[in-house]
């Protein structure tokens, strides 16, 4: 049997349930919860008795260091914010696409990525070009084919939340760079599950939520901004983005020269502590080993489903296949809903996205989880 990479006892719900849904609301480990509770009990409840202004001004630094390690980036380029949408919603104003130029999006991407552009297009007058993802086509190539001299921005997820399709960001970034097109990548469904080296990509902005594969709680997210983007002022400025947030002269603006200027205000510090602990745990396990683990379990699942009616949106042989998010199709749409409900009743939690069964494989999953899922799907 394929054993879990992490200690399953650190996730109490796994004693009674099979959780294949980290792509939605991710599980929090005992270590993460312990650190969050410790902070709440020993610091947060005591206000400034336990945290001075100077300590608060530097409170995000440990998380910033770990995020930089995770992405193999420089700390000065790392932004800590309350949500991925906090950055995504500013990008249309930050990048200012020209009137009548083209912004390329994926029509089935997560709405947080597309909706800021849809709203901005009404007033800025640029064109939205939706690329449609289909199983028979390579999504990376479909995106590249739409890039032309009139394109201003490409904004897309590294891994699609519903299908698990993983685009080739390096290849895409080579084309956007050549054409003078800005590239924005959301790695929410990738960071923590597959290795990311920001130096391999030539992009402008990266964003990521903290409550899925990174193992944190809601209310905290991360971003990376290129040196070129850092030369610009954030469209939305908060008090905490100042070089020294606690210099309280309300008549002066002295923004940080780093991505710290994107932190707008007091964050959920308990979520900061939780995400920092969760990322430390992931780094200890090794992101590469986590990816290899999901590869093995995905292979097991495909072997179990070999003679069933269930088929993956992306075949395992596809270069765009992601082993940690598997989107399963069935000839009968009713079978998908009924199977999902039956699995849930029996304590196996997965998801339905875009009319398909979505299976998320994490480091705490083992061969028995996949065996149970395979057997249940064969009964349909």
Predicted feature residues:
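Pyridoxal 5′-phosphate
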Residues: 1-380
